[in-house]
């Protein structure tokens, strides 16, 4: 599949940088509706040093952070939010269904459910090999 956005283009849109930029590329964008992106999880991730020795597992909160970053890209692609920053305003209904480990390819899906002025809600889901590993509802706030 052809990349819609590269890591360099992603870093031009969102402020996250190493070691907390969790998107390798964007696979698909339907403007104002949904986005799918990829994170290749490798043993070289800093968080694996302590989470957990001998049983490396990606922390659930970092999966949610990756989903929020993907949502930020979709939101900031909207004309009215160009040049702004999207922040997490809330996390609801978070569920973790299986662990994410080195070698996994994390597919990150975000769909806008509701948007009013500078506040919105998105449905966020992460998959590994078509298996749902995490889902949540993210409230976002756009500002400077």
Swiss-Prot record:
Keywords: Cytoplasm, Lipid A biosynthesis, Lipid biosynthesis, Lipid metabolism, Lyase. The keyword Acyltransferase does not apply. It is an enzyme of class 4 (lyase). The active site is at residue 51. InterPro entries: FabA_FabZ, FabZ, HotDog_dom_sf. GO terms for molecular function: (3R)-hydroxyacyl-[acyl-carrier-protein] dehydratase activity. Signal peptide: none annotated. It catalyses: a (3R)-hydroxyacyl-[ACP] = a (2E)-enoyl-[ACP] + H2O. Its EC number is 4.2.1.59. It is found in: Cytoplasm. Its main location: cytoplasm. GO terms for biological process: fatty acid biosynthetic process; lipid A biosynthetic process. The keyword Metal-binding does not apply. GO terms for cellular component: cytoplasm; membrane. Belongs to the thioester dehydratase family. FabZ subfamily. HAMAP family: FabZ. Involved in unsaturated fatty acids biosynthesis. Catalyzes the dehydration of short chain beta-hydroxyacyl-ACPs and long chain saturated and unsaturated beta-hydroxyacyl-ACPs. This is 3-hydroxyacyl-[acyl-carrier-protein] dehydratase FabZ. It comes from Enterococcus faecalis (strain ATCC 700802 / V583).
